[in-house]
Amino acid sequence: MNRIFPEQLNHHLAQGLARVYLLQGQDPLLLSETEDTICQVANLQGFDEKNTIQVDSQTDWAQLIESCQSIGLFFSKQILSLNLPENFTALLQKNLQELISVLHKDVLLILQVAKLAKGIEKQTWFITLNQYEPNTILINCQTPTVENLPRWVKNRTKAMGLDADNEAIQQLCYSYENNLLALKQALQLLDLLYPDHKLNYNRVISVVEQSSIFTPFQWIDALLVGKANRAKRILKGLQAEDVQPVILLRTLQRELFTLLELTKPQQRIVTTEKLPIQQIKTEFDRLKIWQNRRPLFLSAIQRLTYQTLYEIIQELANIERLAKQEFSDEVWIKLADLSVKICL
């Protein structure tokens, strides 16, 4: 089975349409764009009907299989898109295998699955897919990892005709990590705002800051530089957007551990003294901290002590326990109090 990424899809389609596409992943933007692109090309080749089914225990497989056999005899070419559940029961495997075995050239099959669990590739239905090789394509629609996101953003800006420098790309990655849909919208807005199509840090941050939708990363940035009022305002926005407190807690925890790693002492320290900044550039490089985030960490390092950090981490644990026990405004009140403490 041939495996590609969404950004390789246009090149693949230029060489011809496959019989079966397996979209694996959970990123809403990549799944939507990938399926839309496949369907647009298929429409041009006569596949003018589409049947989308969310597969569950109520799915009528007998009717589905019968309709596939009828297509081409009585009906026009059709795209069949199946959203599969994560749990591949024995019955689901059997039905999939039977469906795949009756496919013909007038049916274009698109399968969507959140993840390919260990062992799926050994299941009979998956093996049966390979009979259509090389006309079976697996497309990875997982959200790019932190390491791969800069490359993805660079390719996306280039495809849009935008000229983004490294700092602009880094800021886009940081601000919209795990939210490609918001990233796409930000790029579209930047394209409209700047006719010269050039993107730098200042232009990107202006769009990020003006966004009516706050992100946990904006809250983190405000905390690092000690802007308590801004941090509390963002926190209220996140609460209004129904962001889960646990997401904020885990994001903050990760940044605090990064601070500890950056300032790892080489000798005994006094916990009430400010965090050490010796060899800080070396540590920034070792941990691959983006250039535009280094001043933020420096601001926090020059303001905080180990004792304060440990107290903050302990309070994070207390708030997380509270968040898991009950859903109340008290969690948000404690997060606001913690924000002030970090900014002092």
From Swiss-Prot:
Molecular function (Gene Ontology), one example: DNA-directed DNA polymerase activity
GO biological process, one term: DNA-templated DNA replication
Keyword Nucleotidyltransferase tagged: yes
Catalyzed reaction equations: DNA(n) + a 2'-deoxyribonucleoside 5'-triphosphate = DNA(n+1) + diphosphate
Pfam families: DNA_pol3_delt_C, DNA_pol3_delta
Cellular component terms per the entry's GO annotation: DNA polymerase III complex
Highest taxon of the lineage: Bacteria
Keywords, alphabetical: DNA replication, DNA-directed DNA polymerase, Nucleotidyltransferase, Transferase
Enzyme Commission no: 2.7.7.7
InterPro entries associated with the record: DNA_pol3_clamp-load_cplx_C, DNA_pol3_delt_C, DNA_pol3_delta_N, DNA_polIII_delta, P-loop_NTPase
Subunit structure: DNA polymerase III contains a core (composed of alpha, epsilon and theta chains) that associates with a tau subunit. This core dimerizes to form the POLIII' complex. PolIII' associates with the gamma complex (composed of gamma, delta, delta', psi and chi chains) and with the beta chain to form the complete DNA polymerase III complex.
Family the UniProt entry places it in: Belongs to the DNA polymerase HolA subunit family.
PANTHER family: DNA POLYMERASE III SUBUNIT DELTA (PTHR34388:SF1)
Function: DNA polymerase III is a complex, multichain enzyme responsible for most of the replicative synthesis in bacteria. This DNA polymerase also exhibits 3' to 5' exonuclease activity. The delta subunit seems to interact with the gamma subunit to transfer the beta subunit on the DNA.
The name this protein goes by in its record: DNA polymerase III subunit delta
Name of the gene this protein is made from: holA
